[in-house]
A protein has these predicted regions:
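Generic structural signal for small/hydrophobic residues in well-ordered secondary structure
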Residues: 8-9, 47, 88, 107
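Short, well-structured N-terminal submotif of metal-dependent ribonuclease cores
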Residues: 1-39, 53-68, 124
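Histidine- and aromatic-rich ligand-binding microenvironments
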Residues: 8, 40, 96-97, 118
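Conserved beta-strand segments of alpha/beta enzyme cores
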Residues: 36, 76, 128-129
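Active-site neighborhoods of divalent-metal-dependent phosphate/nucleic-acid chemistry enzymes
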Residues: 59-63, 71-117
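Alpha-helix capping/helix-boundary segments
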Residues: 11, 43-44, 84, 103, ...
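Acidic, PIN/NYN-like endoribonuclease modules and their adjacent C-terminal/linker elements
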Residues: 2-4, 104-132
Length: 132
């Protein structure tokens, strides 16, 4: 299976808004050179919700931002599948955020590296060889 990197929502947002100081340099290089980079479909909802609630400011309308932040930028939208939902509900409930559990399950399903600065992710033994 080719190496894929799954971006947590905040990493995706920082990349698209060029807020590079938040992303470790090694990660940025790995993301730029990876054969495949993707985000969980739930990340689109997470961005939309955060924008609606005023927790983040987008430089353009949401629909335009989402379109530009995906394929034109080289980011693949990874679908939410039944297998991913089953993995997510079967994870040990370390992380209470269902969005993050779906992102973790997406990375596991794709056997992908996961780029996230969420400190709870490292508590999942399943992610031991997958976290960047």
């Amino acid at each position: 299976m080719p190496e894929i990197i799954v971006l947590d929502t905040h990493i995706w947002f920082w990349l698209m808004t060029q807020d590079f100081q938040e992303i470790p340099d090694l990660w940025q290089t790995a993301i730029e050179t990876a054969p495949q980079v993707g985000v969980s479909a739930i990340s689109c909802y997470e961005i939309a919700l955060a924008s609606q609630k005023g927790r983040l400011e987008l430089p353009c309308p949401l629909s335009e931002w989402l379109k530009e932040a995906l394929l034109p930028s080289g980011i693949e939208l990874l679908p939410l599948t039944p297998e991913i939902t089953i993995r997510a509900v079967n994870l040990v409930p370390i992380h209470k955020d269902p969005f993050d559990r779906l992102i973790i399950a997406t990375a596991l399903e794709y056997e992908a590296k996961l780029a996230s600065v969420d400190n709870l992710f490292s508590k999942y033994p399943e992610l031991e060889n997958y976290l960047m």
